[in-house]
Regions:
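Conserved NTP-donor binding/palm subdomain of two-metal-ion nucleotidyltransferases/polymerases, i.e.
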Residues: 1-115, 121-421
């Protein structure tokens, strides 16, 4: 682990658990700030009680950034309140997913970096909620790329992405990224039933409709697992850690959570991620249910999280894109579909002339070859990247969260398994 990552982890432990931090004398604080941003946890550090050993200029910069984040948090909270008031006035009572429903577990909710307002409505009310929002100034956000357009058509609107006054909202028809119909049906039934027993939680002066703690915890766990293949960062880990600290006692684990996580194939992932938090992020070891987690896997998962960044933000360079591409198992059919979609997404001529569409896969093949081979020592690097991709695949497989060729989607009026690409 490099010194920047060590400093980031030390800061998080100091702010959250009051551990005495230890920083190298030559710490590159600009690099630390960048890493905190790329992991989407700057607010957690800046919004807490900073150690005195952090230089004054850095403290001032972080405190200013924390103020900006806090302002955005309350703006989003107000927008969420307006949406809930609109829906409730018309007999629609959704629950908030992730976002504020994760922030409530933090010492100060505004410490958490926020994105969209995600909410789940009862299936029979989704179309009504969509129509109501469209009639009240909310607009659908258009998907631009061919890949995203096809994916949206395939999943038959897993969620509707909308915007108003600069804020984004996701109206979910269902939630989860799973590979077996039985798993999805079980989780969906739990969430739909959970909406009938939603809990009102006070968050920064606003009433927050949430799923019961079992269902809400599974949403946070599945959210991290679902994004793992594309890249998860410390914010996903923090959401889970703060939930565990607040809710997931040994008794709760044994009575209900373990069986539920096992049903979704996420029991080992839950144990490893929690034990990782205890070993490296300072989570108190009061929860003993994860003590049998493989410590080697904990270290590998931490390395992966630090390497990826928030939603894979640190994968933006060509080397990382090639590693991720090579880490995902694909059949010949999947490779051809991937190349075809890449070609349609980047070949302007194929977008303009229909006669060229059948040959888009060839353009996609050339594009990937150019990316992979147009580098110094390309063949040697490809070999190393293939090895790294294999290691990533093995890690996700050992954690039980490696997605196979199929993914479950909602089609018509039922869940079905369909090839992911």
């Amino acid at each position: 682990m490099d010194s920047i990552s060590q400093t980031v982890l030390s800061l998080l432990r100091a702010v959250l658990w009051k551990e005495e931090p230890s920083f190298p004398e030559d710490t590159d604080w600009n690099a630390v700030t960048k890493e905190l941003n790329m992991q989407a946890v700057l607010g957690v550090v800046a919004g807490g009680e900073l150690p005195r050993s952090v230089p004054a200029k850095v403290r001032e910069q972080w405190e200013y950034l924390a103020l900006i984040q806090g302002m955005r948090f309350y703006q989003l909270l107000h927008a969420q309140d307006e949406l809930l008031a609109l829906l409730n006035a018309h007999g629609i009572y959704p629950v908030i997913l992730k976002g504020m429903a994760a922030a409530v577990y933090y010492p100060s909710p505004e410490m958490r970096a926020m994105g969209d307002v995600d909410f789940l409505a009862q299936r029979k009310q989704v179309d009504e909620a969509l129509t109501l929002m469209l009639a009240n100034g909310y607009e659908l956000v258009e998907e631009e790329s061919a890949c995203l357009k096809r994916f949206r058509e395939l999943r038959n609107n897993k969620h509707f992405l909308m915007q108003k006054d600069g804020h984004h909202f996701e109206l979910h028809r269902y939630f989860g990224v799973l590979d077996l119909t039985a798993k999805m049906q079980w989780m969906d039934a739990l969430l739909q039933e959970g909406m009938q027993r939603r809990e009102q939680t006070l968050c920064c002066g606003s009433q927050l409709p949430m799923l019961p703690k079992l269902a809400n915890g599974l949403v946070l766990l599945q959210h991290a697992a679902g994004h793992a293949q594309g890249g998860i960062g410390l914010r996903h880990v923090m959401d889970w850690m703060m939930y565990v600290h607040t809710c997931l006692t040994d008794e709760f684990w044994q009575e209900s959570f373990a069986a539920a996580a096992r049903m979704l194939g996420l029991e080992n992932f839950a144990k490893v991620m929690t034990r990782m938090c205890q070993l490296y992020l300072g989570l108190p070891a009061s929860a003993s249910w994860c003590c049998d987690a493989d410590h080697a896997l904990c270290g590998q998962l931490l390395h992966y999280v630090l390497e990826q960044g928030h939603f894979g933000l640190k994968q933006s360079n060509v080397d990382e894109r090639i590693k991720r591409l090579l880490s995902e198992p694909k059949s010949i059919g999947q490779w051809l579909r991937l190349l075809q979609l890449s070609g349609m997404n980047h070949w302007e001529a194929a977008k303009k002339y229909a006669v060229l569409k059948p040959f888009a896969w060839m353009y996609g093949c050339g594009r990937y070859a150019h990316l992979a081979l147009g580098r110094n020592q390309a063949l040697g690097r490809l070999h190393e990247e293939k090895q790294e991709g294999d290691r990533r695949s093995k890690l996700l497989k050992d954690l039980g969260i490696l997605l196979g060729e199929k993914q479950v989607f909602w089609m018509g009026d039922q869940f079905v398994e369909h090839e992911r690409k």
